[in-house]
């Protein structure tokens, strides 16, 4: 009786004992007050900002809405969350009581060879490894941090999808624009070629002029297939991200043209925003927390393990019309004390400490890389704006020069070479403008991704906008359903 009272008094003290190992504290690192080309105003919570809406492109909006539902990478990341949640249960299970039940029955001869003996019994066993030094509590703490890291990985998968999808859409529209430019130039050059043939018949042009005009026509025809190929490659990638047939996406894109232009404000916030908004920083911090908790797990293994165990076994015996019951029970503690292990347990502690130190370095590197990514993207966007404006003015100037050269050639005041050179310059300037628009749009994407905006944005696509993609998905699912 006294032993039970002693156990009842000591047990709460053992279970409430402190855990070994360091407690995790959120790491800190000095950051600049502002980005070199940014403002001093915080951007706030950018996670819910659907920045792709600033392109004012309904097709793009419907693709993003559909992609977040259908993308396999996002679904794969969600499955990792489920696995991490199960690991939390597994990590804490070792510190909980374990019960088992065994039922047995046997028949045999008794002491008298003419009698039969029937014995049936039930055994209920209970074991409880007391988490005196916090091994399983630290293990659970580590697993919970890993679960948080898995949730951050889902956010990473969502934003990676959005970045890939929007960038591929920008590329597809760029190649569409290039094809349109080349076809318009082909028409103009074909007209010049036809006019030159008429000039030859009238004796006002030479065979060399015809060959030069024809060469420019052939050159333009030759560049179109490559541009069409690149358009289709971009469309194929969009289809893969949306789990749609390529033909469906190509037909949707061919219904309209025009490069997406970002119309939103440039608001990169301040470096301190990145600690809150960048899920890769949050993921690195959670990985550090998990590694720190593992130090406590390793240190707890250096100390004795105390296990309480007990069992109760009622048995029923029947022989020659007589029967009776027997009750057996046992209860007691056991102590497992590590003495000689060749230094393995202490080496585990050192390994855990090194892993935690490496996790801190990884966190700090992630923070510094995040700041650089925003700095680079912000600088690129501001310069891209000037480049696009200059390219646009260049196109206007050269197109005006082409008109003057064409009119002068028609009047016989200048040579065909002047017209052909002006056409080449127009073609080059138009291609450069399209590339500048593409680069500006993609750098806006890069900036918004760098500040980690939009991964938790609500779906804003209306049913009318998303009807095409939704109908295509429904047809695919019905075609593959049994």
Curated annotation (Swiss-Prot):
Residues making up the signal peptide according to the UniProt record: 1-17
GO cellular component terms listed in the entry, alphabetical order: plasma membrane
Subcellular location, record wording: Cell membrane
Lipidation (N-palmitoyl cysteine): 18
Positions of S-diacylglycerol cysteine lipidation: 18
Keywords: Cell membrane, Lipoprotein, Membrane, Nodulation, Palmitate, Plasmid, Signal, Transmembrane, Transmembrane beta strand
Recorded topology in the membrane: Lipid-anchor
Primary localization: membrane
Family according to the record: Belongs to the outer membrane factor (OMF) (TC 1.B.17) family.
Protein name: Nodulation protein T
Lineage summary: Bacteria, Pseudomonadati, Pseudomonadota, Alphaproteobacteria, Hyphomicrobiales
Gene: nodT
């Amino acid at each position: 009786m006294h032993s039970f009272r002693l156990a009842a008094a000591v047990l709460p003290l053992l279970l409430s004992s402190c855990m070994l190992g360091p407690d995790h504290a959120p790491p800190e690192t000095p950051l600049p007050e502002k980005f070199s080309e940014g403002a001093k105003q915080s951007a706030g919570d950018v996670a819910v900002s659907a920045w792709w809406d600033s392109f004012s492109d309904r097709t793009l909006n419907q693709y993003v809405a559909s992609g977040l539902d259908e993308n396999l990478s996002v679904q794969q990341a969600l499955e990792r969350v489920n696995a991490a949640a199960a690991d939390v249960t597994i990590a804490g299970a070792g510190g909980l009581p374990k019960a088992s039940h065994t039922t047995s029955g046997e028949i045999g001869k008794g002491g008298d060879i003419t009698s039969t003996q029937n014995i049936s019994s039930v055994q209920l066993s209970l074991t409880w490894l007391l988490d005196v030094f916090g091994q399983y509590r630290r293990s659970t703490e580590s697993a919970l941090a890993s679960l948080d890291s898995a949730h951050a990985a889902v956010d990473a998968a969502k934003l990676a999808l959005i970045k890939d999808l929007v960038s591929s859409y920008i590329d597809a529209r760029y190649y569409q624009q290039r094809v349109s430019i080349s076809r318009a130039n082909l028409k103009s050059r074909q007209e010049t070629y036809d006019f030159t043939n008429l000039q030859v018949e009238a004796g006002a042009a030479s065979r060399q002029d015809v060959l030069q005009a024809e060469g420019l026509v052939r050159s333009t025809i030759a560049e179109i297939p490559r541009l069409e190929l690149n358009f289709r490659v971009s469309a194929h990638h969009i289809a893969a991200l949306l789990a749609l047939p390529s033909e469906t996406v190509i037909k949707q894109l061919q219904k309209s043209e025009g490069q997406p232009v970002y119309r939103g404000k440039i608001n990169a916030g301040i470096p301190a925003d990145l600690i809150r908004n960048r899920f890769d920083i949050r993921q690195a911090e959670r990985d550090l927390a998990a590694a720190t908790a593992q130090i406590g797990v390793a240190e707890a293994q250096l100390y004795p393990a105390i296990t309480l165990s007990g069992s109760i076994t009622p048995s029923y015996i029947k022989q020659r019309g007589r029967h009776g019951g027997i009750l057996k029970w046992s209860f007691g503690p056991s102590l497992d004390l590590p003495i000689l292990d060749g230094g393995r347990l202490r080496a585990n502690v050192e390994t855990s400490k090194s892993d935690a130190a490496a996790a801190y370095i990884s966190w700090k590197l992630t923070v510094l890389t995040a700041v650089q990514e925003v700095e680079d993207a912000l600088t690129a966007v501001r310069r891209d704006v000037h480049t696009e404006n200059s390219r646009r003015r260049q196109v206007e100037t050269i197109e005006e020069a082409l008109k003057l050269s064409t009119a002068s050639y028609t009047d016989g005041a200048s040579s065909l070479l002047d017209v052909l050179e002006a056409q080449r310059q127009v073609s080059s300037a138009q291609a450069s403008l399209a590339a500048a628009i593409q680069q500006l749009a993609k750098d806006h994407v890069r900036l918004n991704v760098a500040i980690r905006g939009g991964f938790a944005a609500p779906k804003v696509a209306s049913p009318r906008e998303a009807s095409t993609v939704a109908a295509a998905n429904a047809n695919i699912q019905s075609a593959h359903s049994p």
